[in-house]
From Swiss-Prot:
GO BP: lysine biosynthetic process via aminoadipic acid
EC numbers: 2.7.8.7
Function: May be involved in an alternative pathway for phosphopantetheinyl transfer and holo-ACP synthesis in E.coli. The native apo-protein substrate is unknown. Is able to functionally replace AcpS in vivo but only when expressed at high levels.
Protein name: 4'-phosphopantetheinyl transferase AcpT
Alphabetical UniProt keywords: Transferase
Record-level Gene Ontology MF annotations: holo-[acyl-carrier-protein] synthase activity; magnesium ion binding
Length: 195
């Protein structure tokens, strides 16, 4: 089972949470995203299982819960990928101009990824950049790695993992799963509010 849920940080961060959870939220700029992620999780799973953190800081359910999840956010958008199949990774990005995106692609993309960029019309290369970027991030996050490892990932390499991508209006969403799964717009659930 794979479940993909998307929502808005600004809405979900104000949603009711199970007792004591709001008090665990960090202070500062990460607070709203943290609260929105916990709201998505508690809306999707009730009661919300205990959450622990891996070596690189990746949140996970305690070992006695046979479920895995990953959260990602970009701007006001947040995504949750939930699985009972094994470790998962997801990445969401708002497709937007970035001053140094070509330089960044040259620095971290593999030859195969560069070939994908070169295969599309120049007007579509920014979208392709975000498609490749989100795939790479999803793979790194599935492994529980850090963003610094993105340069060592080739999203065109066919491994035992399944990597799938979907563009949803101005959003680029990619997931990495341990078993085959094809991400489509129909497989995504949008949450407007949580009561």
């Amino acid at each position: 089972m794979y479940r993909i849920v998307l929502g808005k940080v600004s809405t979900l961060s104000a949603a009711p949470l199970p007792p004591g959870l709001r008090e665990q939220a960090p202070q500062g700029p990460r607070r709203e995203r943290w609260l929105a992620g916990r709201a998505l999780l508690s809306h999707t799973l009730s009661p919300l299982p205990e959450i622990i953190y891996g070596e690189q800081g990746k949140p996970a359910f305690a070992p006695e819960t046979p479920l895995w999840f990953n959260l990602s956010h970009s701007g006001d958008d947040i995504a949750l990928l939930l699985s009972d199949e094994g470790e998962v990774g997801c990445d969401i990005e708002v497709i937007r101009p970035r001053a140094n995106w070509r330089w960044l692609a040259n620095a971290v993309f593999s030859l195969g990824e560069h070939a994908e960029m070169d295969a599309v019309h120049p007007d579509q290369q920014l979208e392709m950049f975000w498609r490749i970027w989100t795939r790479k991030e999803a793979i790194v996050k599935q492994r529980g790695g850090s963003a610094w490892q993105i340069v060592s990932v080739d999203s065109t390499y066919h491994s035992s993992l399944s990597v799938s991508h979907c563009q949803l209006e101005n959003l680029s969403l990619a997931i990495c799963t341990p078993t085959p799964f094809t991400l489509t717009a129909d497989s995504v659930q949008w949450i407007d509010s949580v009561n």
